[in-house]
Amino acid sequence: MTGIELHGKELEMLQYECHVSGAIAPKRPNMLLISENKIDYQPKSAIILCEQKIIRRQLRRARNDLRILSIEAYKSINNIEIIHSNDFETSEWMEEQRKLGKIDGFITSKEIFESLKFNGRRHTLLPDPKEGGGAYFLPIPYSDLIILLTRKSSPKSLTRVMTEKEGETIWWVQNQILGSLTSQELANTSILVRHRKVKSLMEEAERYKDLTLEQACHDSEGEVVDSEVHVELKIEKISKNGKRTIGIHRIIPYSKFEYATISLIRDWEVILREVSQDVPQDSYHDKIATAFIDLEE
């Protein structure tokens, strides 16, 4: 089953005497923009439809002069009363709207794009910008993550063949960070967890001139540690208008990722608490500043 289907249902899983015995790493975690133009080349006020709240906010962050609408909002504005039973029907309808010229593009998954064999151009919303400061798009929670559920009596030799080390890492980290979140909190959260080799991290640090990233690849004595896989973890929340982002980014040696994840969760909770409350007056001359970001919107 998918990771999002298991979210919040672990107690029910235990009642059926099942447990997570492994996971398969996402092969297609990134969403696609179906449009003739990339996001950077969209005309001003272009209409882009997107069902995922956090992706809409990422698009507004990249281009605040576009009309990024949910499907429900678009139907309401245009008095459309069509009801779709699943994501495939919704994507087919959005493709028809695009071909008719009523919208400029829409967001869908790679699975739906390949299943429906759309003819339009596709542009992958990648988590790594082409250059420093460029637009980037972190995946939605549990994106394309497949979980292996088995009963306790199931042979472990069978699951070892199917499961993947990176998939297990992604599930464990995301479940620790997101497992207690409500669906509303989950909707405004994007997260990226992946295994990285030191060589690729060093190349990225050199490309972006990122000294912090480069230091993460050295040990306490300054030597490059090239024998161990690292776990990269990024998590973000974005304001409704896309103008304010809070996030945390960690590069963790695989041997320490469990302890480091618990530490990250504590740091993330502190960050969320601090940025979501009003800033008190330092003196009677000051005005109370509003919170940096509203986590409820």
Predicted regions and their residues:
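Short beta-strand-centered segments that line the small-molecule binding cleft or hinge
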Residues: M1-N30
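Residues that line or immediately flank small-molecule/substrate-binding pockets and catalytic motifs
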Residues: L6, N37, K110
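Residues at the C-termini of beta-strands that transition into short coil/loop
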Residues: A23-I24, N37, E72, K152
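Solvent-exposed alpha-helices and their adjacent loops that cap or buttress functional pockets
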Residues: A25-P26, K38-Q42, K99, L138-P141
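Flexible hinge/capping segments at coil-to-helix
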Residues: M31-I47, L66
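Small-molecule-sensing regulatory modules
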Residues: R56-E297
